[in-house]
Amino acid sequence: MPAWLLAVAEPVTEATEGSAEKGILDAILESNLINIAIILSLLYILGRRVVGEALAKRREGILEELRQAEQRKQEAIERLAEEQQKLAQAQQEAERIRKQAEANAEARRQELLQQAEREIERLRANAERDLSAEQEQILQELRRQIVRQALSKVEQELPQHLNEQVHQRLIERGIQMIAR
């Protein structure tokens, strides 16, 4: 029997020795104390094993949860690293696409500028050609009008001042001027 149980039971037995009535009660009390001591001892012995096993299981469960949490943490760190790598690659790809788009835009801008310059040059050449043709046409029309007016005036004044031979030469000159 454990020492603490004997220490509790001893004062109770000393106090009950003086009376006979108390003898029965003391015996019951003593037997109850012994029974309680036995039950407590059994509970301690058996309970220690059960509680120890329960605590060991609980500790194993906690350790397993910690291992799983650590594993999930490592997996999360690995996934994070992978996602960061993917993000970096996506950013590099986006930068490459942006630079390519800028280069394409610049090339297209240069192409459009060159095309516009060629179109301006073509329009300028057409305008100069049209202007030259129009100027030539106007000059020819002016020459014709001048020749007509001159001939008309000469025809009015010439018969009075010239003879037939001079008249014929003037007509030929007028025809030559018109032919130019």
UniProtKB/Swiss-Prot annotation:
GO cellular component: plasma membrane-derived thylakoid membrane; proton-transporting ATP synthase complex
Chain ranges passing through the membrane: 33-51
Functional description taken from the UniProt entry: F(1)F(0) ATP synthase produces ATP from ADP in the presence of a proton or sodium gradient. F-type ATPases consist of two structural domains, F(1) containing the extramembraneous catalytic core and F(0) containing the membrane proton channel, linked together by a central stalk and a peripheral stalk. During catalysis, ATP synthesis in the catalytic domain of F(1) is coupled via a rotary mechanism of the central stalk subunits to proton translocation. Component of the F(0) channel, it forms part of the peripheral stalk, linking F(1) to F(0).
Protein known as: ATP synthase subunit b
Recorded topology in the membrane: Single-pass membrane protein
HAMAP family assigned: ATP_synth_b_bprime
Family: Belongs to the ATPase B chain family.
Lineage start: Bacteria, Bacillati, Cyanobacteriota, Cyanophyceae, Synechococcales
Coiled coil: none
Compartment(s) of residence: Cellular thylakoid membrane
Subunit structure: F-type ATPases have 2 components, F(1) - the catalytic core - and F(0) - the membrane proton channel. F(1) has five subunits: alpha(3), beta(3), gamma(1), delta(1), epsilon(1). F(0) has four main subunits: a(1), b(1), b'(1) and c(10-14). The alpha and beta chains form an alternating ring which encloses part of the gamma chain. F(1) is attached to F(0) by a central stalk formed by the gamma and epsilon chains, while a peripheral stalk is formed by the delta, b and b' chains.
One Pfam family in the UniProt entry: ATP-synt_B
Keyword Zinc tagged: no
GO molecular function ontology, one term from the record: proton-transporting ATP synthase activity, rotational mechanism
Keywords attached to this entry: ATP synthesis, CF(0), Hydrogen ion transport, Ion transport, Membrane, Thylakoid, Transmembrane, Transmembrane helix, Transport
